Regions:
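Start-transfer (signal-anchor) and selected internal transmembrane alpha helices
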Residues: 101-139, 758-767
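Extracytoplasmic/lumenal acceptor-recognition loop(s) of multi-pass membrane glycoenzymes
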Residues: 557-628, 713
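Active-site-adjacent helix/loop segment of glycosyltransferases
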Residues: 1-39
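Active-site-proximal, structured, solvent-exposed surfaces of multi-pass membrane proteins
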Residues: 670-767
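Membrane-interface coil-to-helix junctions
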Residues: 135-210
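Membrane-embedded helix bundles of polyisoprenyl
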Residues: 207-220, 224-327, 334-350, 525, ...
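Periplasmic/ER-lumenal interhelical loops and adjacent helix-loop junctions
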Residues: 110, 165, 338-424, 547
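Signature aromatic-anchored transmembrane alpha helix within multi-pass, membrane-resident enzymes
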Residues: 488-532
Length: 767
């Protein structure tokens, strides 16, 4: 019975693997064989008994010698590891055992001349250099404090804080949180619960990850070689060159990794009949044909990750699905998978997008830094649409000009030159090349429009997403260059069969010159970008800063009173303010209203901030601050007269932290929870509730609040002012309140992502 059960479990396991590998016929065979073995377990038991009887009659020495001939478990694992290491070595060094010498070379008069290939792998060189440069370039991030930038909020404290930002509901807002917040939550697990360590590591390795992602695409198009590595390296430098790294832009850094995978699966879908150039170059060891369903699943998977950052990028899978249905009308399943798969992943987030449609056009953390300086016009051609963090003009011109030269050569090669090979990446004569050119022009227009217009997101004016269209536009140029390079390689292979006395045409000469100089042109772009990365690509707005609020302020925020701090910064005649607490700002703070989702709290806080910035404070300033649960007032950059006028208000205790910053403590121990008993006014709750009455939490209105006293959940009461009220009744003990954890949203996102991951997986061989 034990043997039959083991065979049944093995059959079920193979059944699941084959179903994941999209081979249902073989999976059914495995299932049937497993059931047949289990039903005939009496036969198995009889055969086992006969085998035991036979062994009992044999000489023990003979049995031992026979067992030595059988492979041990250690040898099986050793063979598997050796086979994997051999395949990996063949992929890294595909020409290690080849010297390009044929039998004709050996039998000719000049057989001593051999065409040796170098064993130096350009890909290994790229990885090594980018690791070293990344470590040196991020030298300013090593030390204490938290890394912050234009679009990078401070990391939360600990693993629980990272998961809290993803799964905890936001009061006053419907739907789940932005799905991209799951990435740092899971990433913090890998860094042993240290989100700040995750941030530092990602700043060092993100350009490398971006280049590796692009290398997978370009090696599919061009094959292995120096040109492929240069194209991938330049793509990896784009977030550095355009300032995405220095700004801490999650959108730019993540899309740098995501977009090449989307392009790769699109290429497989649109050109299913094309041959992988890597196989032609001899590096196709262990490769297999990727099915249409796997490619559609891969595109849906990576598109889901992209639209969790920029929902407007959903137009990409929609456009691909339309193209699929136009060329292959019967592939409705593929089109539906590409379009609906990403929506399934972000479905918990859709209700929030519907209530705030402006978020669909922006990138991650849109309201974190709304007042960002942008440019339009010719600056768009060199990637300077967003000013903060972007490389200086000299570096961008030196880096982008060679790319433009290579792109113009590619357009001439693929569109104008009549001798261009048709069977390249485009798959059809010039039509899809023109489509790529149109895509680039559209991206250029969208970048210009986004840099000049504003959209409203949670009552804040912000620019639409600019970085995605910058990256897509630059990626189109690189794909055109890769396609032209592939076309030139194919024509060069065809030219080897021409008669020796035939003179090359002008087009063939220009192709040869361009093909010969293309690596050097790309080297200039990569070198300029790398120098800027090394000098200042990870600096600018990026810095590591200690807590801007004194320790005694943060201690009160973390206490049972859970107070807020009103921070006002006066700079060049304009005032900026924020209402912070122990959890904000942090990851995801730019995905929700800046001050509060309750307009009454936000308006009152804004009125107080403007009054503090100008010095025209009311006499009851301390009472108004206390009514909002504000325990401290932080002011920086104001003149001495403004500081004096604010300090004259009663109920405030002043403390100067530095020459430009002043902090006032609100007297009376304010709290975000108030208790009102019969016949008495509201008093702040400092931790425990010891009498009956009504508890009011100064939070945005939301029926999902869970308020407990000593573990007993309180029932809601009528409240006409700010906050939510609850009846204490007979409950006594510590007062706690929290929003629910949206496990359902996380489960939907993870299950949908897992389904797409299975669909995108490799396909098992069919019968």
């Amino acid at each position: 019975t034990r043997t039959s059960l083991a065979l049944l479990v093995a059959s079920v396991w193979r059944f699941l693997v084959l179903m994941v590998g999209k081979a249902p016929s073989r999976a059914v065979d495995e299932w049937r064989s497993g059931l047949q073995l289990w039903r005939s377990r009496s036969v198995t038991r009889e055969m086992t008994q006969r085998l035991q009887d036979f062994h009992a009659q044999c000489d023990p020495d003979d049995l031992e010698n026979t067992n030595r001939l059988l492979p041990s478990r250690r040898s099986v694992w050793a063979r598997a590891v050796d086979r994997y290491a051999g395949d990996l070595s063949d992929r890294i060094h595909p020409w290690r055992n080849e010297d390009g010498t044929t039998i004709d070379d050996l039998t000719g008069d000049d057989f001593t001349v051999r065409d040796h290939r170098s064993v130096v792998n350009p890909y290994t060189v790229m990885v090594s250099l980018m690791v070293v440069i990344g470590i040196v370039a991020c030298r300013g991030l090593y030390g204490s404090g938290r890394a912050t930038s234009t679009w990078l909020a401070p990391a939360p404290c600990g693993l629980a804080g990272a998961w809290h930002r993803w799964l905890t509901a936001v009061p006053g807002l419907s739907g789940g949180n932005a799905p991209w917040l799951a990435w740092p939550a899971f990433g913090s697990v890998l860094t042993i619960g240290e989100p700040e360590v995750l941030v530092r590591i990602l700043f060092v390795v993100t350009p490398l990850l971006t280049a590796m992602s692009a290398h997978r695409l370009f090696r599919r198009v061009v094959g292995l070689g120096t040109t492929t590595v240069l194209l991938a390296s330049f793509w990896g430098m784009l977030p550095v060159l355009t300032g995405g790294l220095a700004r801490g832009s999650v959108t730019a850094l993540a899309l740098g990794v995501i977009l090449p995978h989307m392009a790769l699966h699109t290429w497989r879908l649109v050109n299913p009949e094309t041959v992988d150039v890597v196989e032609l170059r001899g590096a196709g060891t262990g490769s297999h044909q990727v099915g249409g369903v796997s490619s559609a699943g891969g595109l849906a998977l990576w598109s889901a990750l992209a639209i969790s950052l920029v929902p407007a990028l959903w137009v990409y899978p929609v456009a691909v699905a339309v193209g699929i249905l136009m060329t292959r009308p019967r592939r409705l399943l593929l089109g539906s998978l590409v379009v609906l798969g990403p929506l399934l992943v972000i479905s918990p987030w859709i209700p929030r997008l519907i209530t705030e449609p402006g978020r669909m056009a922006t990138g991650a953390e849109p309201v974190l830094s709304p007042a960002v300086e942008t440019r339009a016009g010719l600056w768009l051609l060199v990637g300077r649409a967003i000013v903060p963090g972007t490389a200086p003009t000299a570096f961008t011109v030196i880096a982008m000009a060679p790319l433009w030269i290579a792109a113009l050569w590619a357009v001439w090669r693929l569109v104008i030159d009549r001798s261009a090979s048709i069977g390249s990446l485009t798959g059809h004569p010039r039509g899809r090349v023109l489509a790529l050119i149109i895509v680039y022009l559209v991206c250029l227009v969208l970048t210009g429009v986004a840099s000049r217009t504003l959209v409203t997101v949670w009552n804040v004016q912000v620019h639409p997403a600019i970085e995605p269209w910058q990256l897509v536009g630059a990626g189109v140029l690189l794909i055109l260059v890769a396609a032209a390079r592939q076309s030139a390689m194919l024509q060069r292979a065809e030219a080897d069969h021409f008669p020796a006395d035939e003179s090359p045409t002008l087009g063939q000469l220009l192709v040869g010159i361009g093909n010969r100089w293309l690596p050097w042109v790309l080297t200039i772009s990569v070198t300029a970008s790398g120098v800027w990365w090394l000098v200042g690509g990870a600096r600018g707005p990026m810095s590591t800063t200690a807590a801007t609020r004194p320790a005694y302020v943060t201690a009160v925020e973390d206490s049972a009173r859970h107070t807020r701090t009103l921070m006002v910064n006066v700079h060049r005649g304009s005032a900026h303010w924020n209402l912070v607490d122990s959890n904000n700002p942090s990851w995801g703070s730019g995905e929700r209203p800046t001050i509060s989702s309750d307009s009454r709290i936000a308006d009152l806080a804004a009125d107080l901030a403007r009054a503090v910035a100008t010095g025209a404070v009311p006499d009851d300033l301390a009472d108004r601050l206390s009514d909002l649960g504000i325990g401290h007032l932080w002011l920086r950059g104001a003149g001495a007269d403004v500081v004096s006028q604010v300090g004259n208000a009663s109920g405030l205790t002043v403390a100067n932290t530095d020459p430009t910053t002043t902090v006032w403590t609100v007297d009376g121990h304010p709290s975000r929870a108030l208790l009102s008993s019969r016949g008495s006014s509201q008093v702040p709750v400092t931790g425990k509730v010891t009498e009956s009455g009504t508890v009011t939490i100064l939070e945005p209105r939301d029926h999902r609040w869970r308020v407990e006293v000593g573990g007993t959940r309180l029932s809601p009461a009528v409240r006409h002012g700010i906050g939510e009220s609850y009846q204490v009744g007979s409950a006594r003990g510590d007062l706690t309140w929290s929003m629910p954890t949206q496990r359902w949203a996380g489960a939907i996102e993870l299950v949908a992502l897992l389904i797409l991951l299975v669909v995108a997986g490799p396909q098992a061989a069919q019968r």
